Regions:
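A generic structural signal for tightly packed, nonpolar segments enriched in small/aliphatic residues
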Residues: 2-221
Length: 222
């Protein structure tokens, strides 16, 4: 496999501003890890959220909620595990793995509630809760992934505790706009007794993430 890493202020030079913004307050510089493998077959890109520790930022988590936040890189770990399996079994794929790796920390230059940020794609985002940082780093990584026009993009993330509220601890919620992928995933989940639950793209909800000040509202949690 070939691996390249974009670190610190180089993220700004490479137009990955959201990854830089989320991680700039930490002593360890934010970075984007880019792994590629394989020269034939369909193009598969995996994107994993790599928030290596999450304090919540200026919207600081309570102590009881912060204790396990070293696990907020679960998406990155999962895609690396899947990539290892793909490479070890020699699957006929052109594989790419993108991991935005950051710590969401607190310092004088941390991003703030009510900041307006511009993403790689050019969309602006109003920050109303700095503890919703995962979707920011994924946004830039997914935009980069899409530029390569892969046959399929799969992202994995410990994105929100609201998933547990919605479907409980036993079901893994997911979104997909690919009916064939949905059928394959649901079949595999049933075969291996590892249940998943498809979440809806419900058009009437779209105005809830369009605040008017920016193109998008980061979160409904204020």
């Amino acid at each position: 496999a070939r691996i390249s890493v974009i670190t610190g202020d180089d993220l700004l030079a490479q137009n990955l501003p959201l990854i830089h913004t989320v991680g700039r307050a930490a002593d360890r510089a934010p970075r984007l890890i880019d792994l590629t493998w394989g020269k034939t077959g369909k193009k598969l890109t995996l994107v994993g959220k790599g928030v290596c520790f999450d304090t919540g930022g200026l919207n600081l988590k309570p102590g009881a909620s912060m204790g396990l936040m070293k696990k907020d890189m679960g998406g990155a770990a999962a895609v690396l595990g899947l990539a290892h399996m793909i490479m070890a079994t020699g699957m006929d794929l052109q594989l790419r793995v993108l991991i935005p790796a950051v710590e969401n920390s607190v310092s004088g230059n941390a991003f703030r509630p009510q900041d307006i940020l511009t993403s790689r794609k050019g969309l602006t985002v109003e920050i109303n809760n700095t503890d919703a940082e995962g979707r920011l780093v994924l946004a830039d990584a997914l935009a980069l992934a899409d530029e390569d026009k892969p046959d399929q993009i799969i992202s994995m993330a410990t994105l929100t505790g609201a998933a547990r509220v919605a479907v409980g601890p036993d079901l893994a919620p997911y979104f997909s706009d690919d009916p064939d992928f949905v059928a394959a995933l649901e079949s595999a989940a049933a075969t291996h007794a590892d249940p998943v639950w498809r979440m809806p793209f419900h058009t009437p909800y779209e105005p809830l993430i369009e605040p008017g000040i920016a193109h998008l509202d980061l979160s409904l949690i204020h």
